[in-house]
From Swiss-Prot:
Bilayer disposition of the protein: Single-pass membrane protein
Name the UniProt record assigns to this protein: Uncharacterized protein 141R
Principal location listed in the UniProt entry: membrane
GO cellular component terms, semicolon-separated: membrane
Stretches that traverse the bilayer: 49-69
Organism name: Invertebrate iridescent virus 6 (IIV-6)
Protein's cellular compartments: Membrane
Region (Disordered), start-end ranges: 1-21
Keywords: Membrane, Transmembrane, Transmembrane helix
Amino acid sequence: MYYRRQGEPQEMYGNGNNSVSSSAVNTYQPYYKEDFNILDPALSDSQRYIIYAIVAAILLLLFWLLYKKYGHKIGRKGSVSMFY
């Protein structure tokens, strides 16, 4: 079971009501791991895999562009010449 402090949601939005009246009673209330999901839990598996594929494609494109820009610095010739 996971717990969070009771005052957290109100303090996040800053409603200006920072009373300590309920702090003594029931300081912790249960919450669930699903609260921390990045993706919507209502998504089906196929939609989830589509999102994963898009994220993977973006990461691969980013690494490819970085390798195109800086790849000559970590090329084989530069690293081999150290040892010979």
